[in-house]
């Protein structure tokens, strides 16, 4: 599912809202999550999961084409950990008994 499909589904379930208003709300939520992560904050949506930032240290990499060693700078990457309710629901729907915890 892409963002436009999400907006459309939410608008269909909420006929009292205009689709452009739903799109503005979805964009505002995503912007707030990104802003919080950029500040170094953790964003927890109870039952859904938590977004955080992991910091990867600089390391030596390798160019796969030439085999030459190249330095890879440190970087921050987004990380998402699923919430318990989401894991349980996904496992119930797929029949998987391993909760991944």
Swiss-Prot record:
Pfam families: Bac_DNA_binding. CDD domains: IHF_B. InterPro entries: Hist_DNA-bd (IPR000119), Histone-like_DNA-bd_CS (IPR020816), IHF-like_DNA-bd_dom_sf (IPR010992), IHF_beta (IPR005685). Residues 57-77 are annotated as: Disordered. One of its GO terms (biological process) is regulation of DNA-templated transcription. Keywords: DNA recombination, DNA-binding, Transcription, Transcription regulation, Translation regulation. This is Integration host factor subunit beta. It comes from Rhodopseudomonas palustris (strain HaA2). The gene is ihfB.
């Amino acid at each position: 599912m892409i963002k436009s499909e999400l907006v459309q589904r939410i608008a269909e379930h909420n006929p009292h809202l205009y689709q452009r208003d739903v799109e503005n709300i979805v964009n505002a939520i995503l912007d707030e999550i990104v802003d919080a992560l950029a500040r170094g904050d953790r964003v927890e949506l109870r039952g859904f999961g938590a977004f955080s930032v992991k910091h990867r240290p600089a390391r030596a990499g390798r160019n796969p084409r030439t085999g030459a060693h190249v330095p890879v700078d440190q970087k921050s990457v987004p990380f998402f950990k699923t919430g318990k309710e989401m894991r349980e629901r996904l496992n119930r729907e797929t029949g998987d008994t391993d909760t991944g915890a």
